[in-house]
């Protein structure tokens, strides 16, 4: 209110008071009425009804006109009751002022005859019980568990008390009432015999006091708390000039009018009483603040522990925060009226906004984090860059903003040094600022929103926040909030910067944090409800919003855990994917943050139990395990990195990185240049780490090792033996932890088999070794096997698939064809007996059988595969020639393959394919078959040697035979009967019978004539011995081939 309006108001009060006093003294010429007053019953009754229901500012003129024209004298008692009832219905200020003027006009006409009963009725309406204060507990219904008044009861009581008190104060200022003596005689009886009223209305010393002083004393009664604090605050604000002005007021004219209206004594008394009341209110507000913080912390902890927020408690807490905010605002207003400094702790309302909106962090008024909070979160972040991004924010106070503006301006003017140029730039800056002030705010906001997608750094975010500081209006805030909530689904990388901007601007208004939290929460619930209808980019964007709001501590922790709980309720693949994204985004933060550490640990344990109890697919299980490992990786010791020498680095780059199919020969040339005596161990370690080589480059490594065999055979044999030994050891010990390494080794030995660097028998033995003994027993006895370790079975099956995919066709075309056919049936039984296999392994199973043996049927049921295997084994058993009681699957010694002589399962039909007949004419074979006392191992050894030799002869490639030298044309030698008394054969037999010499025919040619002559060569010469051995071997070979063809099934 301006000074002129205030002076006019005070003069009006003084004029009305003077007229009221004159009317009280009996002056009848103050209020002029019509000479002929209307005494119509109908009009007078209508006036009474209108006083009861239509006492408003719109009807003021009609009321004044009727007061001047109607008699109304006979109806004064009814009018007093009706007008009090009408005043109780007035709520608006203009209606109250109009009603005061109407009552003041009636007071001028009828004086005490109307005023006394009217004031008595009004006072009785305000005080139903004369001995009780306005804030007595009898006016409210207190809760049973809490000493608090319900909001409904409090609001209804305030709506009733506020207008009545306003009427009485206005009546006092206008002179309608002065002290209780004016109406005390009209009050109901308070005799001690009356059970209803046991105390008098007023004490004798209070009858002489102004009614306003008594009313304010009653309002400032703190015996029953501060329930009427809003009423007192509104009245003090409204009548601060009339009732609480001090003597040192600057405006002397106003002070003089106030002194005439309200004496200094009573103003001083009211200020003193109000000052005492504010002191008590300050202590009360401090207690309420502590109680609020305690309840807030308690509710937050309970919601975090249960991962299920209690909405009723948080709604009650929100209402509690609103009441505290109202009390603190009233405290600040009363302190301002009394010109006293209010407590800074009570003036800070940000903490209540954060608590009501669910903010977890505690910041001071400038937005800085407290030192205790800094200590608690010191170990939350991985590096200082994350700490500064999520924990350090600019302050929006005058000093910091001026400093930031000056730093930005200096950075833009970095190249300018001279003072004159600096002054010119400052003038330009001022001019541009003036121009900007003339620009419409909407266009500036448009430009600001267009620059949001380019905000991709911490510095740009701070600058954008500072720029918005000058655009802080309700409309601009709403537009910015809408832009922050509508990020394109393919631009999830902008979410951290957008949320940081909202965190900085939350110092200006809590709308930024609450709006983003509500948007993210509703979007997440809608996404979980719709399941797979959302695209991956949309899911990632929503989860990123939740995570960033959690890291900036804008979203309450109980809401975050509520999102986690929604993901594990149904535990579908969609929920698992969302849960994994949440864990990877903010799971580590929640696990490290002190307030949520225990809850997050219990939540991770619940996820582990749910995972074990659910039959998850391998892909879903892998995704969830990776997320859990990312959140809480196992503790490991510090890995000391071994410093490699220059040669080791060169070999690592040469073999494990650059080795490909097209550079095997250059690599071989470089390796040959090494000193193989001094660098033997380095070369061995590098080549043995086959898992460090690219999986597609293992073929090149096998070819490289085959080429090295010509120069360093011992080294190559050492590498192959150790690789096989490592594989056998891993299979026997069920060491499938480093399964990727074992798969690489299996691929490596398979590539060696393809290029004939490794014998087929070694691969076959390894394949049979991958089928465990208990499985074969179950196949033979036709009983279902007991699965003890499904992970071990899956590891073995994957090794089998790798080997068959790499060298399966090569093995099936070798001498082990029948063995491999039997093995493929056993492999199908082994695979189909598993209870449940992943889809990828099922597809590999179907593909590998068709790749190795296209004509073989792929069985999909265990019973069919078992019957086929049984028939196959029965046919082999019937065809066995040596021992009908011998088992079909028998352990074979693998000493010729690996140095540790591992036991493998080798079908004996391999020997049956290459076994020769007893009637062979070869000397060694006939001796072997005729010696019954010889050991069975020697027989198997010799049979194996014959099989290997036969394989060498039959598997020679056409390319190798093309490069061999063609033998000379064998023509029959001419016979000379005149010089030889016996035919050629006879002479040859005679010469062969001689022990000292052997006859050879030498064929020569001169011109077109051939000539022959005989030579006697000593029998001990190398030519004679090699010729005899060659003839013997050819005879034996022809007989073996003939017998095998005859015995072929």
Curated annotation (Swiss-Prot):
Modification type Phosphotyrosine: residues: 60
This protein's name: Nonsense-mediated mRNA decay protein 2
SUPFAM superfamilies hit by this protein: ARM repeat (SSF48371)
Biased composition (Basic and acidic residues): 422-433
Native source organism of the sequence: Schizosaccharomyces pombe (strain 972 / ATCC 24843)
Record keywords, A-Z: Cytoplasm, Phosphoprotein, Repeat
Matching InterPro entries: ARM-type_fold (IPR016024), MIF4G-like_typ-3 (IPR003890), Nmd2/UPF2 (IPR039762), Upf2/Nmd2_C (IPR007193)
Main location group: cytoplasm
Positions of the UniProt region annotated as Disordered: 412-438, 909-934
UniProt-annotated location(s): Cytoplasm
Cellular component GO terms held in the UniProt record: cytoplasm; cytosol; exon-exon junction complex
């Amino acid at each position: 209110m301006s000074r002129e309006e205030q002076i006019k108001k005070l003069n009006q009060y003084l004029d009305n008071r003077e007229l009221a006093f004159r009317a009280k003294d009996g002056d009848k010429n103050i209020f002029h009425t019509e000479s002929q007053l209307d005494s119509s019953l109908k009009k007078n009754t209508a006036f009474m009804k209108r006083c009861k229901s239509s006492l408003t500012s719109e009807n003021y003129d009609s009321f004044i006109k009727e007061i001047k024209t109607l008699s109304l004298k006979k109806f004064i008692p009814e009018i007093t009751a009706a007008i009090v009832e009408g005043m109780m219905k007035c709520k608006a200020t203009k209606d109250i002022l109009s009603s005061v003027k109407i009552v003041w006009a009636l007071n001028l006409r009828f004086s005490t005859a109307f005023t006394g009963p009217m004031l008595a009725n009004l006072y009785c309406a305000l005080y139903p019980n004369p001995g009780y204060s306005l804030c007595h507990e009898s006016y409210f219904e207190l809760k049973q568990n809490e000493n608090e008044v319900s909001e409904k009861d409090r609001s209804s009581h305030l709506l009733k008390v506020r207008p009545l008190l306003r009427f009485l104060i206005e009546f006092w200022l206008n002179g309608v009432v002065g002290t209780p003596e004016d109406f005390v005689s009209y009050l109901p009886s308070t005799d001690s015999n009356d059970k209803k009223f046991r105390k008098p209305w007023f004490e004798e010393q209070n009858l002489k006091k102004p009614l306003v002083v008594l009313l304010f004393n009653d309002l400032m009664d703190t015996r029953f708390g501060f329930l009427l604090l809003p009423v007192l605050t509104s009245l003090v604000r409204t009548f601060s000039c009339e009732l609480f002005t001090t003597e040192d007021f600057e405006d002397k004219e106003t002070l003089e009018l106030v002194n005439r209206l309200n004496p200094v004594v009573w103003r001083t008394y009211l200020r003193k009483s109000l000052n005492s009341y504010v002191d008590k209110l300050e202590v009360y507000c401090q207690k309420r603040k502590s109680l609020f913080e305690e309840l807030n912390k308690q509710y937050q902890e309970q919601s975090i522990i249960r991962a299920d927020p209690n909405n009723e408690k948080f709604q009650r807490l929100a209402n509690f925060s609103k009441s505290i905010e109202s009390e603190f605002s009233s405290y600040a207003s009363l302190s301002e009226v009394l010109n006293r400094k209010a407590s800074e702790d009570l003036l800070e309302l940000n903490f209540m906004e954060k608590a009501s909106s669910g903010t977890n962090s505690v910041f001071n008024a400038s937005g800085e984090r407290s030192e205790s909070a800094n200590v608690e979160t010191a170990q939350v972040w991985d590096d200082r860059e994350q700490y500064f991004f999520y924990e350090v924010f600019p302050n929006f106070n005058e000093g910091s903003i001026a400093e930031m503006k000056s730093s930005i301006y200096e950075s833009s003017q970095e190249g300018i040094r001279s003072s004159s140029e600096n002054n010119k730039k400052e003038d330009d800056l001022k001019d541009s600022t003036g121009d900007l002030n003339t620009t419409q705010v909407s266009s500036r906001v448009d430009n600001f929103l267009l620059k949001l997608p380019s905000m991709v750094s911490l510095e740009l975010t701070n600058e954008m926040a500072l720029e918005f500081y000058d655009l802080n209006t309700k409309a601009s805030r709403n537009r910015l909030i809408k832009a922050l909530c509508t990020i394109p689904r393919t631009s999830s990388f902008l979410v951290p910067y957008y949320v940081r901007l909202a965190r900085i601007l939350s110092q200006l208004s809590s709308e930024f944090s609450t709006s983003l939290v509500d948007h993210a929460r509703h979007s997440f619930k809608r996404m979980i409800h719709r399941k797979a209808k959302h695209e991956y980019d949309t899911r990632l964007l929503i989860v990123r919003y939740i995570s960033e709001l959690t890291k900036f501590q804008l979203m309450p922790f109980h809401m975050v855990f509520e999102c986690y709980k929604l993901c594990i309720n149904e535990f579908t693949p969609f929920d698992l994917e969302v849960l994994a994204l949440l864990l990877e985004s903010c799971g580590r933060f929640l696990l490290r943050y002190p307030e949520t550490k225990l809850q997050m640990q219990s939540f991770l344990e619940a996820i582990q139990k749910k995972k074990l109890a659910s039959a998850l697919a391998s892909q879903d299980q892998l995704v969830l395990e990776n997320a859990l490992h990312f959140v809480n990786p196992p503790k490991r010791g510090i890995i000391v990195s071994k410093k490699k020498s220059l040669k080791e680095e060169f070999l690592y780059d040469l073999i494990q990185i650059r080795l490909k199919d097209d550079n095997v020969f250059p690599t071989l040339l470089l390796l040959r240049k090494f000193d193989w005596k001094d660098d033997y161990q380095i070369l061995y370690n590098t080549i043995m780490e086959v898992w460090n080589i690219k999986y597609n480059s293992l073929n090149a490594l096998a070819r490289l090792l085959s080429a090295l065999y010509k120069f360093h055979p011992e080294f190559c044999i050492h590498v192959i033996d150790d690789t096989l030994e490592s594989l056998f050891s891993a299979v026997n010990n069920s060491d499938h932890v480093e399964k990727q390494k074992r798969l690489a080794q299996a691929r490596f030995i398979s590539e060696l088999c393809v290029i004939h660097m490794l014998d087929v028998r070694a691969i076959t033995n390894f394949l049979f070794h991958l089928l465990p003994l208990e499985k074969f027993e179950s196949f033979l006895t036709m009983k279902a096997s007991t699965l003890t370790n499904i992970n071990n079975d899956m590891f073995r099956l994957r090794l089998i698939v790798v080997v068959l995919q790499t060298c399966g066709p090569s093995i099936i075309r070798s001498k082990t064809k029948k063995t491999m056919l039997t093995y493929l049936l056993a492999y199908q039984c082994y695979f189909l007996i598993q209870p449940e296999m992943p889809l990828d392994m099922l597809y590999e199973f179907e593909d590998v059988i068709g790749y190795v043996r296209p004509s073989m049927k792929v069985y999909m049921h265990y019973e069919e595969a078992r019957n086929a295997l049984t028939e196959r084994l029965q046919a082999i058993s019937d065809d066995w020639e040596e021992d009908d009681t011998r088992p079909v699957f028998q352990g074979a010694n693998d000493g010729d393959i690996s140095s540790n002589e591992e036991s493998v399962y080798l079908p004996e039909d391999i020997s049956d394919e290459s076994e020769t007949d007893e009637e062979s004419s070869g000397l060694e074979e006939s001796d072997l078959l005729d010696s019954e006392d010889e050991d069975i191992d020697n027989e198997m050894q010799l049979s194996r040697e014959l099989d290997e030799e036969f394989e060498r002869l039959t598997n020679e490639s056409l390319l190798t035979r093309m490069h061999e030298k063609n033998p000379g044309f064998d023509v029959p030698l001419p016979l000379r009967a005149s010089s030889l008394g016996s035919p050629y054969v006879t002479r040859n037999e005679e010469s062969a019978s001689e022990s000292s010499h052997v006859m050879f025919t030498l064929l020569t040619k001169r011109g077109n004539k051939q000539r022959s002559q005989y030579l006697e060569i000593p029998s001990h010469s190398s030519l004679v011995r090699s010729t005899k051995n060659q003839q013997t071997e050819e005879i034996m070979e022809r007989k073996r081939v003939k017998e095998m063809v005859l015995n072929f099934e």
